A protein has these predicted regions:
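Hydrophobic alpha-helical and helix-loop surface patches within well-folded domains
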Residues: 1-178
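Non-catalytic terminal regions of proteins
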Residues: 176-198
Length: 198
């Protein structure tokens, strides 16, 4: 539900101009979905969701041809469904989290609000996105431009060197309980299922 709600902004208010720019809808929406989860369930839950997204991204990176791991795709002469994989979602949201981590949430949120105000009700291309972020967030700061690695995130395959894997300890109790059950150290009824949710 959170994902589809977030499409009110990224997908409806500002939408991708072509299927090559699909990540602009899904990467932003996945990022917003995580922010909604953080607001409702707290930081630890949001990071747990980020870890699951990151792990899925790692799996996808291993299975796709390198060109299909770029955010901005080249689907010329191809079925647009060829670009419908988790790269747009998970790499796109990881890219936005990287920008947030580098510039800080307050500054990033101010840029996000402005981005949607400036571009409301118009189709967006990746080039237009990059122009906007350079004009309204980077603002000519060469050191920040280098640190963000915008072009590497968008146009290069795989992940740039500034990608940071999220880390969560929240999975340990679940893994410990599952392992204890597996090795026969307790009945399934002893596992605290009531505290878990999906």
């Amino acid at each position: 539900v959170a994902h589809e709600l977030a499409h009110s902004w990224s997908g409806n208010l500002v939408t991708n101009a072509t299927w090559n720019d699909f990540w602009l809808n899904e990467g932003f929406t996945t990022y917003f979905e995580n922010r909604i989860m953080e607001s409702i369930y707290g930081h630890d839950r949001a990071v747990q969701e980020q870890v699951l997204s990151w792990d899925g991204l790692q799996d996808e990176l291993k299975t796709l041809a390198a060109p299909d791991t770029r955010l901005h795709l080249d689907l010329k002469g191809r079925d647009p469904d060829d670009g419908m994989n988790t790269i747009a979602y998970d790499k796109g949201s990881a890219f936005l989290r990287t920008i947030e981590r580098i510039v800080g949430r307050q500054k990033f949120d101010a840029w996000l609000r402005g981005y949607f105000d400036r571009n409301a009700y118009r189709p967006m291309t990746t080039a237009m996105f990059l122009d906007d972020i350079r004009a309204n967030l980077v603002k000519g700061d060469a050191a920040l431009e280098r640190e963000l690695q915008l072009d590497a995130w968008v146009y290069q395959p795989g992940l740039p060197s500034n990608a940071v894997a999220p880390v969560s300890d929240a999975f340990k109790p679940v893994d410990d309980a599952a392992w204890a059950f597996f090795v026969g150290k307790g009945p399934a009824s002893a596992i605290p299922w009531a505290q878990w949710n999906t």
